[in-house]
């Protein structure tokens, strides 16, 4: 990467989702190809990696809370969840407020359906977060 930062994926799985087809291709979310696959670790090992890191980047998840508890800056990508829901105020929260966002307070989430968008807008809340928005937050940290 351009910033010469090693990126590790420490999620539970290297891919997830229900595999619903998009066209003829099963759709799964996969870890970024440029990251080092450290998925499937115990919480303790994940905590060790976080503790040694400069910062943590993730979604609204238990690992983000763990990083926060370990006093690491958390670059958090938000879509359907409100920006005041986590570690507020945080200078490293990323949310595109020019599109649909913060809808999960208005609906009963269907956690069993990976492709359920509460506003039926195909998750524009996260799709419209640009690499530039992410890089801007990371630049504040390094």
Name every feature range the model reports, one short phrase each.
Residues 27-30, 68-141:
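Nucleotide-sugar donor-binding patch of glycosyltransferase catalytic domains
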């Amino acid at each position: 990467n351009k910033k010469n930062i090693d990126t590790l994926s420490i999620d539970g799985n290297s891919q997830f989702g229900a595999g619903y087809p998009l066209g003829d291709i099963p759709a799964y979310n996969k870890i970024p190809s440029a990251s080092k696959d450290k998925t499937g670790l115990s919480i303790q090992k994940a905590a060790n990696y976080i503790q040694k890191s400069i910062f943590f980047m993730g979604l609204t998840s238990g690992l983000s809370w763990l990083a926060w508890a370990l006093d690491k800056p958390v670059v958090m990508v938000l879509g359907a969840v409100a920006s005041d829901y986590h570690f507020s105020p945080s200078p490293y929260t990323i949310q595109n407020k020019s599109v649909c966002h913060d809808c999960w307070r208005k609906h009963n989430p269907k956690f069993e359906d990976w492709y359920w968008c509460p506003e039926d807008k195909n998750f524009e809340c996260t799709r419209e977060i640009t690499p530039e928005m992410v890089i801007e937050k990371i630049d504040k940290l390094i």
